[in-house]
Amino acid sequence: MSLSGVPLSAGLAPSPSNKPTNGKGQNIVRRSGNYKPALWDYDYLQSLPTLYAGEAHVEKLNKLKGEVRIMLEKTVTENPLAQLEQIDTLYRLGISYHFQDEIKALLNTIHNNNNNNNNNDDVYATALEFKLLRLYGYTVHSEVFNVFKDEIDKGFKAISLCGDYVKGMLSLYEASFYSFKGETILDEARDFSTKHLQKYVMMRHNNNSKDQSVDDDDDLVILVEYALELPMHWRMIRLEAKWFIDVYSKRRDDMNPTFLELAQIDFNLLQSTYQEDLKHVSRWWSTCKLGERLPFCRDRLVEVFLLAVALKYEAEFGYARRLLTKIGVLVTLMDDIYDVYGTLDELKLLEDAIERWNINELDQLPEYMNIFFVAMYNVVNGIAYDVLKENEILIVKYLKRAWMDACKSYMVEAKWYYSGYTPSLEEYLENGLISITIPLDLIFLYCLTTSPITEDSMEYLLQYPTILGLSGTLFRLVDDLATSSDELKRGDNPKSIQCYMHESGVCENDSREYIKNLISETWKQMNEVRVAKSPLFSQAFIESAVDFVRGAMLLYQKGDGFGTKHDGDAKDKLVSLFFNPIPTP
């Protein structure tokens, strides 16, 4: 089998007529997704100026990194809270990845001295330490919060809403999202802190009151409102950095100008790198002419690229981001072929063609499937060729199997649609964690970023281990909460919300609450996998699986940011991340 690229014109069957028929002379009625066109066209993406590329900016970045390293080394060891606050600030500014060794050294000391800590009566310090230790994979027990519970009624102690207390409640709230299954004390902490933070916000906004019982720092209420909207642990790192850089720059007392300048330059440099990536993938998209030949599909190049950035945001992973974007675009096309456009007979033909994986046997495919198959064949085989050169292992058969699994899961849903079948929630999710194609994307990520690659590791990936399943399930549920109403309007299958309604006889609002709770519970499982050391996967790969879900939380936070409502909140976030640099002096 050749791994060389095949021209997109190869094997394309001529269209028998302008109107598709089912082989019996009857016209086929196609559904429509009613998708809006792309927000950014080829000319716009190619015109991006990449203002912050160049050696001068890199030299400035490296100089500032050196200064920050010195600061971290000089942090007073007798003040672990100051160390924790520095680490937290670096993380939120999006620059902690430059200082992993220094941060690990500081946290090792803090973790080893846990028995001697003096934070037992400080909810802010205790929660901050707990959050950061779990964030960086340390073993830390939730019982540390028992000291803040009332000995009589066993609930958390209530104190007046002074500024320091609100900081403590915010810290407790953020820490609670790192909980594991069965840690009821963190469930209680989340409920308790949420209630008090909501009360604090109401007090601040009540006639713009600045009562003496409430802290007068506007920065604090901004942080609280932002956290209540979505906790930091669930947010995409790069976009979180852009938002926090702006907030941090306005602080009066505890702003570190070196941290700020480094974060600004780092963000702009990465943005320029992303712009070059976008130029590359937009040229590929234009050359393939897939958008022209498959006009019924979503043209979501930039949105797909966002998810590639969520997976690997560092500058050195441009090769992986570009290929992951191509894979994501092809997956989007396949999703629309199966969900919207193709008939059952056509879908079976495509499935058979992927099973054969032979460019010379496409005669039975409709024309629109021909061009899709050849584009997919070229990209997948190109990745396999690169892996063969670097790792001396031929992985085409594994990539084909992964793609086939996705096709089979799509076919299950197509059959549900045509038969009018509503599955149970368990049945839906068992299939849906594959049909969302997150495991497929993660398998490609593994191949693009791992060396060496072995036959055993590929076989293990295709058994869909826990980390792939959790990432797929979370993405599926988050997607469904945002998109199910729009998809039902065009006649799609019931999603998780409707499956649970049908199964349990509850109303839609109750079903949505159940799915939200299921998302929270699944995150707890993800948290446990994060801190468990895998013998087969690097911690970086596991973090990428978590980051994929964070990308979903961004796209679907306020509606279908990938489909029918991609010109709303999601658009603003994409513009902020990819097209608007941070002004610097």
Curated annotation (Swiss-Prot):
Source taxon at top rank: Eukaryota
Compartment annotation: Plastid, Chloroplast
Sites where the protein binds Mg(2+) 1: 335, 339
Top EC class, one word: lyase
Transit peptide stretch: 1-31
Record's compositionally biased regions (Polar residues): 15-25
Leader peptide range in chain numbering: none
Cofactor note: Binds 3 Mg(2+) or Mn(2+) ions per subunit.
Cofactor annotation: Mg(2+); Mn(2+)
Chain sites annotated for binding Mg(2+) 3: 479, 483, 487
Residue numbers binding Mg(2+) 2: 335, 339
Gene Ontology terms: cellular component: chloroplast
UniProt keyword list: Chloroplast, Lyase, Magnesium, Metal-binding, Plastid, Transit peptide
Entry's Gene Ontology BP terms: diterpenoid biosynthetic process
Protein family membership: Belongs to the terpene synthase family. Tpsb subfamily.
Alphabetized PANTHER family for the sequence: OS04G0344100 PROTEIN-RELATED (PTHR31225), TERPENE SYNTHASE 10 (PTHR31225:SF9)
Descriptive protein name: Probable monoterpene synthase MTS1, chloroplastic
Species name: Humulus lupulus (European hop)
Classification of source organism: Eukaryota, Viridiplantae, Streptophyta, Embryophyta, Tracheophyta
